[in-house]
């Protein structure tokens, strides 16, 4: 737990340096469930709210084993088209669709015990 707090502290310190002008709003969006239509709408609303509030950056905290490829692709596209920097923080897992979403971010940070990968599309009959 101590290492986790240390990593968050350095991540916040980095963003404080990065957004050093008068407006220091940094949004955090947590994706901790299966990637699907609900998480897609949640991310889209969070990015829109961050933009409306003139946030300087968004931290996307990921802990997911994946989900549907269509929603992961939509989320990745929204991140790539975001007018503000989006950084992924892999809190524990970013597998499958979670990895695809993390790769779309401007930068990726991971907790030392976190894992990311297995970003393979699975065809189901």
Describe each model-derived feature in a short phrase.
Residues 8-17:
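Bacterial N-terminal signal peptides
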């Amino acid at each position: 737990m101590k290492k986790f707090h240390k990593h968050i502290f350095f991540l916040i310190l980095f963003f404080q340096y990065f957004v050093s002008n008068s407006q220091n709003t940094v949004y955090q969006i947590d994706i901790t469930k299966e990637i699907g239509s609900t998480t897609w709408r949640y991310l889209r609303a969070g990015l829109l709210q961050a933009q409306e509030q003139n946030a300087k950056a968004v931290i996307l905290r990921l802990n997911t084993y994946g989900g549907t490829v269509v929603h992961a692709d939509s989320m990745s596209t929204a991140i790539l088209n975001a007018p503000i920097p989006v950084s992924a923080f892999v809190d524990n897992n970013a597998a499958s669709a979670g990895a695809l979403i993390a790769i779309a971010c401007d930068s990726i940070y991971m907790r030392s015990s976190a894992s990311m990968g297995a970003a393979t599309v699975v065809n189901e009959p």
